[in-house]
Amino acid sequence: MLSRFPLFALITLSAPLALSAPALAQQAAQAAPAAGQMNSAQIAAFNQAVTDFTAGQTAQQAGDNAAAAAKYEAALPAIRTAVQADPARIDNVNFLANALYADAAAQGALGRMDKVIALYTESAPYWRKLVEAKPTDAASRNIFAGILIQMGNQKLVGGDKTAADPLYEEALALARKSVAENGKDAVSRNILLSALIGASQTANDPALSAEALTMGKAMLSDGTIDAMNKPSIEAMTGTKAG
């Protein structure tokens, strides 16, 4: 059983956004709430948040995660206000989800893992709403699945299998959809494998353990397994891949 082996797929640092900052910030700026929904000070704060977010992305891409985190933290309150003012405006939901995710990446690079989990937890409802609104957006779906897995890992490390299980199960459904759409995509397959490894330890389902082992062996063999999943599968198989 997989539960005999240590869970190596623990909290890992978020990758920088694939979407360029100027494009996302411009999209968010265009989606700024109308004057009737927010007062002039709130609109000005939102516009400043777009500027701060863009500066944060620039700093993050240059490797200055401390500056990036500071800019993201400065931007977040106004973006939250915009979403609260008009929860149905999906462009602003997208902006908030990505800003929280980018902040988590910067905080993770600084070793502030408690902050990462808090940001992930806050972002999850927005990612869920975004994925539901854009069912063909595989990139957002994969980001959300990865966030759920990290949240599940944190619960599992803390000994709370009951709380971890639904997080893994939701991630598993998302990852299966991505792999069904593009079975050759290594990123999607690694997300699915991570979800299987986690769910195997909370669901008490031998079929999930077997699926994780079979998939992990194949990915070890073809070299597509990532650094997060590799130690878990090596522990399961009792082998050390080159």
What does each model-identified segment do?
Residues 23-70:
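N-terminal leader/linker segments that initiate helical-solenoid repeat arrays
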Residues 30-34, 198, 205-242:
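Terminal, low-structured helical/coil segments at or just beyond the last alpha-helical repeat
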Residues 62, 103, 110, 151, ...:
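Structural motif corresponding to the intra-repeat A-B loop/turn of tetratricopeptide repeats
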